[in-house]
Amino acid sequence: MTRFILLHIILFNFMKGGIQVQYDHLNIEVYETSAQGNKLNKINEFSKNINQILITIKPEETFQKIIGFGGSFTASSAFLLNTLSQENRNKILAAYFSEQGAKYSLTRTHINSCDFSLHNYAYSNIPNDKHLEHFSIDEDKKDIIPIIKDAITISKDGFKIIASPWTAPPWMKDNKDWRGGKLLPEFRNTWALYFSKYIKAYQQEGIKIWGLTVENEPLGNGNNWESMHYTPEEMTDFVENYLGPNLESAGLSYIKVLGYDQNRGDELVRWAEVMFKNKNTAKYFSGTAIHWYGSTYDYFPESLQRVHQLAPDKYLIQTEACIDGEVPKWKDDTWYWSKAAKDWGWTWAPENQKYLHPEYVPVFRYARDIIGCLNNYVNGWIDWNMVLDKQGGPNWANNWCTAPVIADTVNNEVYFTPLYYTIAHFSKFIRPGAVRIGFECLDNELMVTAVQNTDQTIAVIVFNPSVMEKVYQIAIKKENFNASIQPKSIQTIILKKLKPAI
């Protein structure tokens, strides 16, 4: 184990005629993932330079509480896991949920089908079944539920699950289609009941749902796959007068309800202003859900700060992010560290917004976004699919994406991309209940964040996107240590004080 033992000055206390000696040990571990090939490797040796970058950690300055990091249980990911050999299936689940793996603590799944399903489906397909007498989650029992159960068994500390619908069943909507349209007023109570039925059905399977988002991407997706549209006023009315009261009467008031669930920026602020307008509108909202697809580089700190100002006692949770394009190459780490990825906006964004969607480095986008979110009051961060195939599916709408783990089901092979290790730098070392703490970094290129876990360990994340190695010194109170970070790399530094008995 890599350790730097720093002895405090010995404190002499004269007690009962004798001398009591006390001192602190500072146990420091450094883990690095880099373009040069490190993958969460412990680092033992560092470069030295008289011109060090000072990073000061300020545990006395505290901010938001962290609830977790993780990915999503989609039908596509679950199907692939069940298609692989038992050995590879277990290997992937252990990599995400075990103590030796990434220790995912916050996850998401979908209510009814989504684009990352093998086909369209709902839990109630009988038109005008207002009391949902034919409600059934049998479709999820094929793949999603068995995978979640296995993950629960593997996870020592457990994990939270947020469930999101992409659409109500078409018979509840004004256009009778899986894509687009709105919920008909006469089915608002039925749709609210649908959520309660879902939560209780999953409870019967031994799976506890922690929270809900009201609707995935209520502004729509161009009617390319499952969706249902709301205005901020419509969603707020639905939560205030239907969903919230229904959950309450069903004994499910502990369920966290998150509004919005789309991209950051001006729209996020507009929705938050409606949701948290007064005590009545805000009553049943536990917070706001956000996505990252508004830009390939901008994490929109101003909008995140504004939402925190509007609702400082509510959650702000990043619920979806991914590289939204086909898997480029098989087992090629270099691509993930190269400025070669394009997102949807490269082609489809309006001309006045294309500047927000330049080509980007996948690892950089993940590291920058997670750190940027943490430094701007976000409580949790969830990736999209955990596993996809070599094309970026299966996806019934041909909306191919890239996941941290890629599976070749034909040859029964698995590829852990650099994205897996990038997320693990956060999920493995920043545990639920951690509190973000203050820091100061005297460098314009490094990105830094710091938290204090409930066991009093401090985790510092340092991201170096530059092509130059950086030598730095971390200072905390009267202690400090020197280290260095390679170009194009991420580090997690764990600081733990020990007080041995003497």
Which residues does each predicted region cover?
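Loop/turn elements at helix/coil->beta-strand transitions in domains of secreted/extracellular proteins
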Residues: Q100-T107, K156-K160, E205-G211, G251-K256, ...
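Active-site neighborhood of glycoside hydrolase catalytic domains
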Residues: T190-K208, P218-K329
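Aromatic/acidic polysaccharide-binding cleft in carbohydrate-active enzymes
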Residues: Q318-Y421, G438-C441
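Carbohydrate-binding surface patches
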Residues: K428, F439-K477, K488
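N-terminal catalytic cores of secreted or lumenal carbohydrate-active enzymes
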Residues: Q36-I209, Y230-E233, N241
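Bacterial Sec-dependent N-terminal signal peptides
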Residues: M1-D24
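C-terminal beta-strand-rich structural cap/linker in extracellular carbohydrate-active enzymes
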Residues: S484-I502
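Conserved, mostly hydrophobic/aromatic
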Residues: G71, K103, I161, L212, ...
